Amino acid sequence: MPQGTVKWFNAEKGFGFIAPEDGSADVFVHYTEIQGTGFRTLEENQKVEFEIGHSPKGPQATGVRSL
């Protein structure tokens, strides 16, 4: 499962980007893909693992879990 670091995440808008550890292009992340209960958000520089899915706008992180 790919891992990366949260580049930025806007909690008000519910989305942001993850920089994958392998150096590939940043991946879009939507709050609905963050695993867990309650308020789902990510912090800048937080380490995460995720799968890569595809949306009409390109690659998107799915099943995002904090490490």
UniProtKB/Swiss-Prot annotation:
Localisation per UniProt entry: Cytoplasm
Swiss-Prot/TrEMBL keywords: Activator, Cytoplasm, DNA-binding, Transcription, Transcription regulation
Highest taxon of the lineage: Bacteria
Pfam families: CSD
GO molecular function: DNA binding; nucleic acid binding
UniProt xrefs under InterPro entries: Cold_shock_CspA, Cold_shock_domain, CSD, CSD_CS, CSP_DNA-bd, NA-bd_OB-fold
A Gene Ontology term for the protein's cellular component: cytoplasm
Major subcellular site: cytoplasm
Every CSD domain range: 4-64
Protein's GO biological process: regulation of gene expression
Stored PANTHER family: COLD SHOCK DOMAIN CONTAINING PROTEINS (PTHR11544)
Protein known as: Probable cold shock protein A
Species assigned in the record: Mycobacterium tuberculosis (strain ATCC 25618 / H37Rv)
Lineage, highest ranks first: Bacteria, Bacillati, Actinomycetota, Actinomycetes, Mycobacteriales
